[in-house]
Amino acid sequence: MSQTSNPIYGLRRNNGFAGGSNPSNNNNNNSNNNHNGNRISLGSATRTSSIISNNLPFRQSLLHGNYDNAINNTPSTSSLQKQSQQQQQSSQTSQTKRRSTLLSTPATTTKRRQSMMGNNLHQQHQYGSTALRHSTQPSSSMNSQFNQALQHVSPYYNPTSYSSQTPSSQPSSQQYQQQQQQANIPSSASSSQQQQSMDPRPLKDKKYQELIQKEIIRYLIDYKFEIKTNIALTENILKSPTQKNFNAIFKFLYNQLDPNYMFIKSSIEQEIVTLLKLLNYPYMHTITRSHFSAVGGNNWPTFLGILYWLVELNLSLSTLNDDDFLADDDFDKIFIEYIWKSYSLFINDEEEEEQQQQEQQQQANNGGSGGGGGDKFYNDMKIKFDQLQEKLNQELNNVEQQHENLLNKYHELNNQLKIRDDALKKTVALEEDYMKLKSYNQNVEKMMPEWNKKLEQLSNEVISYEEQMNKLQDEKKSIEMDLQQRGISIDKVNELYIKRDQLSKSIEIISNKIDDLKEKLSGRSFDLEKNFDNLENLTNQYNEITNKFNYYYYQQIQQNQQQDQQQQEEEEEEEEEEEHQLIPQFGLKLDENIKTTNERRQFTRDEIFLNINVKQERQNLLNFRNELDHQILNDRSQAMKFNEKCDIEQDKIKDQQSIIEELKIQDSLMKRKSDDLKQTIFQIQNEFNSQIESLDQQIRETKSNIQSDILQLERKLRDVNLNKSLIQEQLIGKRQKIDEDVINLTSFILKFKTNIQEKLINIADIVQDQLKKEQQQQQQQQASQQLE
């Protein structure tokens, strides 16, 4: 399909879609593009209309996409053919089950309204436009699956045909890793993050690069790259490329996707990065903006992979037709046709004053109702809609009649089945009864001879029992005669027996009640003990948990004490006492006397626990939970900051890896230079060897002179040692004299000290005696004054 000649495709690639990749261009660009004679405004008439079919689950909008949804919704290549066959069958049988979406906004607003056409139209289901992608999840078999999908979509461009010619052209991931290790290339096994983000395509394999280059060149030739760009396609254009050639190829491939997009010359590298992000290029992590400064060299395989990925994307889109962009529902097709025609009128400025006057006159004739009933397109749409609705109503009536006939047949058959089931059940029951009766008759026939013997025994027993009854009656009469003679009647005896029976029954009832109460009390006491034990276990578990809380508070206090070490020790002790008083000591302690008490009453929660209020404990726990929540929020904010720092560091690591590769290239160049230096050094070494031999002779002569000088120095050293020993003896004598003088001085000082102390003691005694005398004189004077 020629993408430039399709009006629907051009509309979808207008500002409503392509503008999403560069919002600044949508707001500031007031230029107009001509498309098949229809003027399309890029700035003022910004409209979006996305119609997505349900037939192709992997076909979704291109530029407003989400790569994750595309991967999740993309079927595997092995099941694409089955799904296409099923979809063709379902499209022939039931077209009414399909739905589509039409999102339309006027030129002056940005609000989105859902398209509705009366109460009889199907409710439109909104789909968020997601990216059109094949299943390109990073795995070792991704390339084969992707090529199979392309073969299903476009058999002409089939990279697997080349692989059949060269079986070893696409090595496996294991072979590629071995090649990396042999070439001293840093593999991605150094860290788990790099393994997850590694591009599984063997882009650095030369055979694989040749296959990719052939595919790209074939695509460029078929779509007339040389004519449109005036750049000649040669074999070296993709082997030793330039920055200009890469930019031109990328522009051409992207314009195949979005013909209306305009590139900015000053910042094309930044545009490429943003466009790849919008297209959700799956290996964007391997590219940074610094790589675009030097496209060639070691960075070229990654850029070659970008171009090949764009070629595959264009090939997959080349199989789409105009019908793929239309709705599957007939009502939607009618409504879309109406919107398309009215939209083309709006874009071409064909809504002139004459049409407006006609609409106003027709609205006045219709009494102000109808809202544009004279519109030609609207009338056509209404006629088609009515015809389609009549057709569907007829089909629906036919289906309802068939449904009623089938229901009647179903009820008739169901009644017949019920009668048959009842008959079967009755026959089964009769057969069971017959078998039981037959077995019973057989048992009776077997027991017949034994019954005669038992009848004779029973008759003899009856005769003996009758004789015993006669004897007992005679005894009864004799006892009654005796009681009458004694004055005791039989009725009184019977009454006494009845009272005794009643009393015995009442006693039994009371005893049974007592036993029941004892059992209930024992069960209640057992339950109470069990509940008390459970409560004790719960308190122990609670205390174990709260010990951790107390330890947490203790750690906080220690931290506060370390921060306040500059204060005085007394103030620290006082603050520690106050802090210990303010610490909420978590924990509960049961009153063990509850088991032993005989009080018959119900204990409250506060009475069960010793010196602890449960409400206060609960309040302390709530405060502690609030503190923990506050700390968790702080920790999360710090974690977010750390994650941001990690992302920055990862970007730095990627840049450093690229620098390392460049340094390795420099290292290989330096090795070559070092080999050249080794040869020059070997020549210089030979020259120096000849010089060394001449210098050895000079060294021998100098050694003989040095030995004679050493002998002279040894003689001088002996003389110096003798002088040293004499000086040491003189110093020892002087030191002994100094020690004697020091001892004499110390003895003199001690004597002087003792004499002074004795004199001071005597003076103190004299002073005390004088004070006593003066005090006695003062007392005598006071006494004499008092007497006077």
Curated annotation (Swiss-Prot):
Name listed for the protein in its UniProt record: Probable kinetochore protein NDC80
MF GO annotations: microtubule binding
Function: Acts as a component of the essential kinetochore-associated NDC80 complex, which is required for chromosome segregation and spindle checkpoint activity.
Acidic residues: bias regions: 567-579
Keywords assigned: Cell cycle, Cell division, Centromere, Chromosome, Coiled coil, Kinetochore, Mitosis, Nucleus
Source organism phylogeny: Eukaryota, Fungi, Dikarya, Ascomycota, Saccharomycotina
Coiled-coil segments on the chain, per record: 346-788
Domain of life: Eukaryota
Main location: nucleus
InterPro entries assigned to the protein according to its UniProt record, in alphabetical order: Kinetochore_Ndc80, Ndc80_CH, Ndc80_sf
Sequence similarity: Belongs to the NDC80/HEC1 family.
